[in-house]
């Protein structure tokens, strides 16, 4: 004799079991696809940021007006407006032009001009451009540092160009929202088609 609540446990029909299995499989596939798409987009955004800052740093370092301004008694007077125009046009968060000792000639915050650059410069001082992720006065950023060469091919200044991590994250946040909407739609279609 069986003692219990008197309720009998119902078994799911084969059709219901298959439906649940299909929903789980579709859910797992949609989640995996959305996750892979997001990770791929994050890598692409980082690559794009590095390519952008590298190109802008090289362009600024090679600009004839930068060399001319560096030869004046007051480089910041000419370099600051130029750097700010390029920064706005290129869509980067900062362009810092500095002397080889790291003293800033330009900065998005004019109060920081004349202060020390925060970051690595050794590779650029050796004549090679490089990229890094560094936390400076504007927070964490993906940045490139490029040498400015004088007439005798000696390093006479450095250019650092960066995009803040928060700007990259904002781009990814928008993408994530779009991915969630698409994933939900695909999941709904997958469930409806089951």
Place the predicted regions along the sequence by residue.
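Generic short beta-strand
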Residues: 94-96, 132, 146
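Short, hydrophobic beta-strand elements of compact beta-sandwich sensory domains
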Residues: 142-169
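Cytoplasm-proximal transmembrane signaling helix
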Residues: 173-194
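Envelope-exposed proteins and targeting segments
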Residues: 53-56, 91-93, 139, 144, ...
């Amino acid at each position: 004799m069986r003692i219990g609540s008197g309720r009998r446990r119902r078994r799911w029909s084969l059709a219901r079991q298959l439906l649940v299995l299909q929903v789980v499989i579709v859910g797992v596939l949609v989640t995996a696809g959305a996750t892979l798409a997001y990770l791929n987009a994050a890598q692409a955004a980082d690559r794009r940021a590095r390519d952008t800052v590298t190109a802008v740093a090289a362009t600024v370092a090679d600009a004839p007006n930068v060399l001319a301004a560096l030869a004046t008694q007051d480089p910041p007077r000419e370099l600051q407006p130029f750097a700010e125009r390029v920064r706005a046009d290129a869509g980067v968060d900062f362009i810092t032009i500095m002397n080889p000792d790291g003293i800033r000639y330009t900065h998005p915050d004019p109060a920081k001009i004349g202060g020390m650059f925060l970051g690595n410069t050794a590779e650029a001082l050796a004549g090679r451009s490089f990229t890094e992720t560094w936390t400076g006065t504007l927070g964490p950023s993906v940045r490139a540092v490029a040498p400015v060469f004088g007439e005798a091919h000696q390093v006479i200044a450095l250019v650092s160009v960066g995009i803040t991590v928060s700007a990259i994250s904002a781009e990814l946040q928008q993408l994530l929202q779009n991915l969630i909407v698409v994933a939900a739609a695909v999941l709904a279609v997958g469930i409806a088609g089951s």
